[in-house]
């Protein structure tokens, strides 16, 4: 799968150095994968959630979240946000209230 906006990862791990290894491992797995749909993706990323239209990945032992949009037919994953768990909680609250 082609990952768009990988450039969002280094600034995050610069602020949160412990996340660098897990984020790099996540990137390698996604890049190497060919996923036909969300169910197929969950075989590799069991903790991924679909929050329409986003796919949310738990990374680094639930310490950070990657919010992405995936076009399975084009094999493209667009990183929209890389957040800490508390920042994701705030994002989720805004999402549920329709502000995102």
Regions found by a protein language model. Give the residues of each.
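Basic, Lys/Arg-enriched alpha-helical interface segments
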Residues: 1-63, 71-76, 85-100
């Amino acid at each position: 799968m082609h990952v768009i906006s990988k450039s969002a990862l280094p600034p995050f791990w610069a602020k949160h150095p412990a996340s660098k290894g897990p984020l790099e491992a996540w990137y390698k797995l996604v890049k190497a994968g060919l996923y036909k749909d969300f169910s197929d993706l969950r075989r590799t990323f069991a903790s991924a959630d679909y929050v329409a239209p986003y796919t949310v990945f738990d990374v680094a032992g639930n310490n950070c979240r990657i919010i992405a949009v995936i076009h399975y037919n084009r094999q493209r994953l667009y990183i929209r946000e890389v957040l800490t768990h508390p920042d994701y909680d705030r994002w989720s609250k805004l999402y549920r209230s329709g502000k995102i």
